[in-house]
Regions:
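Hydrophobic/aromatic residues in alpha-helical transmembrane segments
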Residues: 25-29, 41, 130, 220
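Alpha-helical transmembrane segments of multi-pass membrane proteins
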Residues: 53-74, 78, 115, 119
Length: 230
């Protein structure tokens, strides 16, 4: 009963918390480059010795540092508060006992907390990297923010409409949401097929987010360096 309460209530609250944190990070990241394009400050910074690639890398590293620290502090406080409220006696309970003995992950609820936090951080950073790329590509902060919000919620809408598909799992924010969150994917047997191979959706989500984190970061730097001042 305690385990059911923990997973059913605490994990649900954590999913919503990570989603809200992702929205906040996207809103903060949107004007990173686009804000300077709008004010014209970009044209001044580009004339300095380190005004292109080095500046882009510094801005991105500063943004990632801010978001990682914010996420880790927030999720740690969040876990401590919820564990204090629901109790820690059930953290050694098997994840398989809560859902089904045939669930693939052979972990306990304490390990599940760490896995969900790590997956949430990776998804948030991948989503932020996409926002940074859009910010380096477009000159209007509002446009960047609107597109980023659409990208953030697209996996949720895709999952509700079509279930577990490639569209609902390969986007940066695939592990963030309600029905499509990483916890629900761990608890289910959703597989995606390509050719003669099958891939478990949690693996697809993590691998895609990891690849997109590096790809979008590189594209953000490249786009900023190639941006032409009007």
């Amino acid at each position: 009963e305690i385990a059911s309460c923990l997973v059913g209530s605490e994990m649900c609250i954590r999913d919503r918390y990570i989603l809200c944190l992702a929205i906040l990070c996207v809103a903060i990241a949107a004007p990173t480059f686009a804000g300077e394009y709008q004010t014209g400050g970009d044209s001044i910074l580009r004339t300095t010795k380190y005004g292109r690639k080095q500046l882009a890398i510094t801005k991105i590293l500063a943004a990632f540092t801010l978001f990682v620290v914010t996420f880790l502090v927030g999720i740690t406080v969040h876990i401590l508060i919820l564990d204090a409220a629901f109790g820690t006696d059930c953290l050694k309970t098997s994840f398989q006992m809560r859902y089904s003995i045939i669930n693939l992950p052979n972990i306990n609820l304490g390990q599940l907390q760490i896995i969900l936090a790590a997956a949430g951080l990776l998804s948030v950073l991948a989503t932020v990297s996409c926002t940074l790329f859009l910010s380096a590509k477009f000159k209007d902060t509002l446009t960047v923010l609107l597109i980023s919000i659409v990208v953030l919620f697209m996996p949720l809408f895709a999952y509700v409409a079509m279930g577990a598909t490639w569209l609902s799992t390969i986007l940066p924010s695939a592990g963030i949401g309600m029905q499509n969150n990483f916890l629900s994917q761990l608890a289910n047997f959703n597989y995606l097929n390509i050719g003669g191979m099958s891939f478990w959706t949690p693996h697809v989500i993590l691998i895609s987010a990891g690849i997109e984190l590096f790809v979008f970061t590189f594209l953000a730097i490249h786009s900023y360096c190639r941006h032409q001042v009007a």
